[in-house]
Amino acid sequence: MPFRFGTQPRRFPVEGGDSSIGLEPGLSSSATCNGKEMSPTRQLRRCPGSHCLTITDVPITVYAAMRKPPAQSSKEMHPK
Protein backbone atom coordinates (compact mmCIF):
# COMPACT_ATOMS: atom_id res chain seq x y z
CA MET A 1 0.00 0.00 0.00
CA PRO A 2 1.54 3.36 -0.97
CA PHE A 3 2.23 5.98 1.68
CA ARG A 4 -0.26 8.84 1.71
CA PHE A 5 0.37 12.18 3.34
CA GLY A 6 -1.92 12.90 6.25
CA THR A 7 -2.51 9.26 7.19
CA GLN A 8 -0.32 9.47 10.30
CA PRO A 9 -0.14 12.14 13.00
CA ARG A 10 2.72 14.59 12.72
CA ARG A 11 5.49 14.45 15.30
CA PHE A 12 7.43 17.49 16.41
CA PRO A 13 10.57 17.58 18.54
CA VAL A 14 10.11 18.20 22.25
CA GLU A 15 12.43 20.47 24.25
CA GLY A 16 15.49 18.39 25.04
CA GLY A 17 14.76 15.76 22.39
CA ASP A 18 12.03 13.41 21.25
CA SER A 19 9.79 11.86 23.84
CA SER A 20 9.19 8.12 23.80
CA ILE A 21 5.54 8.82 24.73
CA GLY A 22 3.22 8.85 21.72
CA LEU A 23 5.45 7.17 19.15
CA GLU A 24 3.65 5.96 16.06
CA PRO A 25 3.15 2.19 15.85
CA GLY A 26 6.20 0.50 14.39
CA LEU A 27 8.67 3.14 15.57
CA SER A 28 10.85 2.61 18.59
CA SER A 29 13.24 4.88 20.39
CA SER A 30 16.12 2.48 19.66
CA ALA A 31 16.47 2.90 15.91
CA THR A 32 18.24 0.29 13.82
CA CYS A 33 19.74 0.61 10.37
CA ASN A 34 20.57 -2.37 8.14
CA GLY A 35 20.41 -4.67 11.15
CA LYS A 36 23.10 -2.74 13.01
CA GLU A 37 22.32 -0.84 16.17
CA MET A 38 22.81 2.90 16.02
CA SER A 39 24.86 4.87 18.51
CA PRO A 40 22.81 5.76 21.59
CA THR A 41 24.09 9.35 21.44
CA ARG A 42 22.81 10.08 17.91
CA GLN A 43 19.84 8.18 16.51
CA LEU A 44 18.61 8.43 12.94
CA ARG A 45 15.08 7.55 11.84
CA ARG A 46 13.47 7.41 8.40
CA CYS A 47 9.92 8.58 7.79
CA PRO A 48 7.39 5.88 6.76
CA GLY A 49 7.86 6.75 3.08
CA SER A 50 11.69 6.71 3.42
CA HIS A 51 11.82 10.26 2.04
CA CYS A 52 13.55 12.01 4.91
CA LEU A 53 16.10 11.17 7.57
CA THR A 54 15.42 12.53 11.05
CA ILE A 55 17.97 13.04 13.79
CA THR A 56 16.20 12.42 17.09
CA ASP A 57 16.96 13.98 20.48
CA VAL A 58 17.73 17.44 19.05
CA PRO A 59 16.58 20.40 21.20
CA ILE A 60 13.92 22.65 19.65
CA THR A 61 16.29 25.62 19.97
CA VAL A 62 18.50 24.05 17.28
CA TYR A 63 15.57 23.93 14.83
CA ALA A 64 14.63 27.53 15.68
CA ALA A 65 18.21 28.74 15.10
CA MET A 66 18.34 27.00 11.71
CA ARG A 67 15.27 28.94 10.47
CA LYS A 68 16.53 32.45 11.35
CA PRO A 69 18.21 34.49 8.58
CA PRO A 70 21.81 35.56 9.27
CA ALA A 71 22.09 38.80 11.25
CA GLN A 72 23.16 41.89 9.33
CA SER A 73 25.98 44.06 10.59
CA SER A 74 25.24 47.66 11.64
CA LYS A 75 27.19 48.97 8.59
CA GLU A 76 24.86 47.11 6.21
CA MET A 77 21.77 48.39 8.01
CA HIS A 78 22.83 52.08 8.00
CA PRO A 79 24.95 52.84 4.89
CA LYS A 80 26.44 56.35 4.63
Swiss-Prot record:
Domain of life of the native organism: Eukaryota
Region (Disordered), start-end ranges: 1-44
InterPro entries with a match to the protein in the record: FAM229 (IPR028025)
The family this protein is said to belong to: Belongs to the FAM229 family.
Name of the molecule in the record: Protein FAM229B
Source organism: Bos taurus (Bovine)
Gene name as annotated: FAM229B
